[in-house]
């Protein structure tokens, strides 16, 4: 039995967007979907009940962070990540590849794996593709990721080619090591930087390995937006129609819409929770920096069109006060709103695909979103 089952329900008439159903051991997910990030087995400032209330059906955990603290064996003893954090819906864990390359110092990459030092205490560790699968098997997440090397931007062709070759070798080894196939679906990750021939080669070779789903990695790392969209558009052409496609680390409202139009089904990003803690919120009329002075006497909600708990009960002036006073509730209320905003945006996107009016929806949404920009 496969761990997941994916079905395309409807294709948009004028774009590559798809409406789908993804069945997992912990529930059914309607796609396209945005997945809140719970790096350390918690979506920062939110309880699982609040996430359910806002409509989250799948969240992320992070292999690198959970391996270092509290340790995957402790989580396994607790009965797995779902039990440990009291979340009974789906979980996807990323492989830790990105964190090893971005957070840890003194890393040494060999064909066998990566030696790195913990960003917490400087202790030395070694990740191999097999080790990363073993950790994720202990965590018990529904969808797990291959260990990959995420090349920086910009990077020269030869470096990215070597990195892509390594990603493919590691994917093969990880797939061989993965034993829990009836309960955990392992996705391959397409790398190749901004070089189309490398993206194509990586996608085709991973598709030959027949993974139950495919991720597009190595984007949103500093490249221009137009180039990112071009690479997404190009890459999805080489991925199977009957498997889910996951764009890693991308999650601004405009990026979600553009990604869906180019055939992506799943997204995650720390941005909505991170900017919320700094006093920035998404609204239907663009980003709003609620801690700024103009809102000191603004008693309207963050977004007149939003019916989340925060917008129904509190004003911009109150949120500004909480941020200025450094109250914990500030982060909670702003985070709730931002996640709710993106989850509802995905609902609207799915409805637009249903009605074959995604391009019209994009135009209406962006016209309003960019019409009153505060960035």
UniProtKB/Swiss-Prot annotation:
Q: How is the cofactor bound?
A: Binds 1 zinc ion per subunit.
- Pfam families named in the record: TGT
InterPro entries cross-referenced by the UniProt entry? ArchSynthase1/Queuine_TRR, TGT, TGT-like_sf, tRNA_ribo_trans-like
Can you name a GO cellular component term?
cytosol
EC no. given is 2.4.2.29
Active site residues according to the UniProt entry: 94, 268
Q: Which UniProt keywords apply?
A: Glycosyltransferase, Metal-binding, Queuosine biosynthesis, Transferase, tRNA processing, Zinc
Location of region: RNA binding: 249-255, 273-277
Q: Which pathway does the record list? A: tRNA modification; tRNA-queuosine biosynthesis
Secretion signal span: none
For binding substrate, which residues are annotated in this chain's numbering?
Answer: 94-98, 148, 191, 218
What is the annotated quaternary arrangement, including any partners? Homodimer. Within each dimer, one monomer is responsible for RNA recognition and catalysis, while the other monomer binds to the replacement base PreQ1.
Q: What is this protein called?
A: Queuine tRNA-ribosyltransferase
């Amino acid at each position: 039995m496969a761990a997941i089952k994916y079905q395309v329900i409807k294709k948009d008439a004028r774009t590559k967007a798809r409406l789908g159903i993804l069945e997992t051991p912990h529930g059914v997910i309607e796609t396209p979907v945005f997945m809140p990030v719970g790096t350390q087995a918690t979506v920062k400032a939110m309880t699982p009940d609040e996430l359910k209330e806002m409509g989250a059906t799948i969240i992320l955990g992070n292999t690198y962070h959970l391996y270092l603290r509290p340790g995957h064996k402790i989580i396994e003893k607790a009965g797995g990540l779902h039990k440990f954090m009291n979340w009974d819906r789906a979980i996807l864990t990323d492989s830790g590849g990105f964190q090893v390359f971005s957070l840890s110092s003194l890393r040494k990459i060999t064909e066998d794996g990566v030696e790195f030092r913990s960003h917490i205490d400087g202790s030395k560790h070694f990740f191999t593709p097999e080790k990363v699968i073993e950790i994720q098997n202990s965590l018990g997440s529904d969808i797990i990721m291959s260990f990959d090397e995420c090349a920086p931007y910009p990077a020269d062709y030869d470096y990215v080619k070597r990195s892509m070759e390594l990603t493919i070798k590691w994917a093969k080894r990880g797939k061989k090591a993965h034993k829990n196939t009836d309960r955990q679906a392992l996705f391959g990750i397409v790398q190749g930087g901004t070089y189309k021939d490398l993206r194509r080669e990586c996608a085709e070779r991973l598709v030959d390995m027949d993974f139950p789903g495919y991720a597009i990695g190595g984007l949103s790392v500093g490249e221009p937006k137009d180039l990112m969209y071009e690479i997404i558009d190009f890459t999805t052409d080489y991925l199977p129609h009957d498997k889910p496609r996951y764009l890693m680390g991308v999650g601004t409202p405009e990026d979600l819409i553009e990604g869906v139009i180019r055939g992506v089904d799943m997204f995650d990003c720390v941005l909505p929770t991170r900017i919320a803690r700094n006093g920035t919120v998404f609204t239907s009329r663009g980003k709003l920096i609620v801690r700024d002075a103009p809102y000191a006497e603004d008693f309207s909600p963050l977004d007149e069109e939003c019916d989340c708990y925060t917008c129904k009960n509190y004003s911009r002036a109150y949120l500004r006060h909480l941020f200025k006073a450094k109250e914990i509730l500030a982060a909670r209320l702003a985070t709730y709103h931002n996640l709710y905003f993106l989850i509802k945006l995905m609902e609207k996107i799915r409805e637009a695909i249903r009605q074959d009016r995604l391009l019209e929806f994009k135009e209406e949404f962006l016209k309003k979103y960019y019409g009153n920009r505060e960035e």
